[in-house]
Amino acid sequence: MSGHSKWHNIKAKKSKMDAQRGKIFTKLTRELVIAAREGGPNPDTNLRLRVAIDKARAANMPKDNIDKAIAKGAGNLEGQEFVEALYEGYGPGGVAILVEVTTDNKNRTAADVRRIFSRHGGTLAESGAVSWQFERKGVIELNKEQVPSIDELTLELIDFGVDDVLEEDDSVTIYTQPDALSKVLDHLNEVGIEVSRAELEFIPKNYISVSEEEGRKILSMLEELDDNDDVQEVYTNADLPEVLTAEE
């Protein structure tokens, strides 16, 4: 899962910069609205909303903004109507790319995404063309200092639907089945382990190694996609070279 780690690490640094200038609040607001609309305003019974609230808090989004977004999603306040879409395509080197969007204008967003793919030498594909190369997983990150033994943690969580527990630099990443994410989060909370990040993501089944030149083109494409306000998440099966991670 090293490719996921590299792109995530780059994106995490970028997200901090986005948060500092308030850009990320637009994306967080849309996710809160959609989550509350689809599953109701109670995070105790709505995992997606629970995760969205945690992300908003981590980005220092004001509580009033969070509450208003949830109220809009629940229908208690008027607001823009958003729809979700998943775009699939290929980037430089033939790597697979998934783009999750939340938009108030699908035609505009589709044109924007297509333009970005084309500008970077990629192509959009039909629905299902590349999504089969990914699996939907719950992803939980912990500070490594909270985990004395990876083996013990793995044994402790195996009955909760955990697929894997990996040690990565100064963090520990737990991968779960989507419907197990909430149970694992509850258990970690009960035993006093603080979660740094928890999300539902598309994880590649296999990664594709790319050259440094291809990696730079792919990274430029991913970053431009991520900069679009309508784009919520971008996933790829590209195993980006270490040198690119060090430069960011």
Curated annotation (Swiss-Prot):
Coiled-coil ranges per UniProt: none
GO biological process: regulation of DNA-templated transcription
The keyword Transcription appears for this protein: yes
GO cellular component, one term: cytosol
InterPro entries: Integrase-like_N, TACO1_YebC-like_2nd/3rd_dom, TACO1_YebC_N, Transcrip_reg_TACO1-like, Transcrip_reg_TACO1-like_dom3, YebC-like
HAMAP family, per the entry: Transcrip_reg_TACO1 (MF_00693)
Family: Belongs to the TACO1 family.
Name recorded for this polypeptide: Probable transcriptional regulatory protein COPRO5265_0905
Species, as recorded: Coprothermobacter proteolyticus (strain ATCC 35245 / DSM 5265 / OCM 4 / BT)
